[in-house]
Amino acid sequence: MTRFDSIERAVADIAAGKAVVVVDDEDRENEGDLIFAAEKATPELVAFMVRYTSGYLCVPLDGDDCDRLGLPPMYATNQDKHGTAYTVTVDAREGIGTGISASDRAATMRLLANPESGANDFTRPGHVVPLRAKEGGVLRRPGHTEAAVDLARMADLRPAGVICEIVSQKDEGAMAQTDELRVFADEHNLALISIADLIAWRRKHEKHVLRIAEARIPTRHGEFTAVGYTSIYDEVEHVALVRGDIAGPDGDGSDVLVRVHSECLTGDVFGSLRCDCGPQLDAALDMVAQEGRGVVLYMRGHEGRGIGLMHKLQAYQLQDAGSDTVDANLELGLPADARDYGIGAQILVDLGISSMRLLTNNPAKRVGLDGYGLQITDRVPMPLRANAENLTYLRTKRDRMGHDLIGLDEYEANQNTAQPGTAL
């Protein structure tokens, strides 16, 4: 497995005017870009980039700067398969020669990053390609364009970068892949990071949720307060059902009983027997109500372990043909579990929780919530609700996904007498 460097090192290098190597997902471009801050552009940096890349040097900018500098899309209808937002090409109007030299392009790059520059400071077309980054950066679009702007911002520089794809030194005509990029980075003392790690870093260190509303919700389990949140960048709405005083007797939000429940329309609403989601939600509400103090956090956007409702229904078709729940996802070209718990962790922190007892049979959920400043003092098992329809699903969760399902062995021993819908 390729060794990646820390995001902290990459940010420090960007701030110091060095280049870094950034790789994206192998299912996307699967390429590595050299990236440095546009305001730090020098003839030497540009010449180095030209030597080891395709030479098609681009300057990612945020949308406000693109508008201020009069940089419309290169083509009215973007047909790029990855949605790269090319704008019209530019050169600096003054102080350069033809615009193509490393010195000239560095001057144009610095001018693009200069907050005092304006549309009239550039000629069009030119030899530098500005790109429009998506608002929200890599959290909205996991591309090199957004990574460059994010890294510059994180380095307390202007939100403008310089990027270009690194070419292979081993296979003429090809782009460098991850293993070769690691060697390249080491040879030139450059940090090598992944966009996936950059996304994870931002989710961990930045606040991405807003508390929108609160309302009293009487249920058959008792009364809860529904606290509504929205995720800033993907606009997904989540609800925390809160029981009692979260601060608790010590006033520090410690030892709170918490269930982080992934949205499941088929199980939670329609009562599908293919999964145990509905019974788990019901049990969690009951356990928190009996505790008198706790939270059931309902995470939207987690349908089908994060693959979405339509893909989940397609996975059901494959399961009916013999695949298990893990292989069905993989056959669709999707991960076995695409859920991210960073937003959930931020909501729990916002509610004032410092430590919790986590209601789950899934050890991975504990790992997913760890590291966000939350202390998990205990994992409380959820009661099993097995039936003939979800038995294969539960076996797969136990055998392939590591879930601790207390009572499943007993149910299996008696399954010959069980009827569809019979619960344990």
Swiss-Prot record:
Residues that coordinate or bind Zn(2+): C264, C275, C277
Q: Where is the active site?
A: D337 (proton acceptor), R339 (nucleophile)
Recorded superkingdom: Bacteria
> What name does the UniProt record give this protein?
Riboflavin biosynthesis protein RibBA
Point out the annotated site residues (description: Essential for DHBP synthase activity): H127, E165
Q: Where is this region: GTP cyclohydrolase II?
A: 205-424
Q: Which residues bind D-ribulose 5-phosphate?
A: R28, E29, D33, R141, P142, G143, H144, T145, E165
EC annotation from Swiss-Prot or TrEMBL:
4.1.99.12, 3.5.4.25
**Cofactor(s) the protein requires to work:** Mg(2+); Mn(2+); Zn(2+)
Organism of derivation: Rhodococcus erythropolis (strain PR4 / NBRC 100887)
Q: Write out the GO MF terms.
A: 3,4-dihydroxy-2-butanone-4-phosphate synthase activity; GTP binding; GTP cyclohydrolase II activity; magnesium ion binding; manganese ion binding; zinc ion binding
- Keywords for this entry? GTP-binding, Hydrolase, Lyase, Magnesium, Manganese, Metal-binding, Multifunctional enzyme, Nucleotide-binding, Riboflavin biosynthesis, Zinc
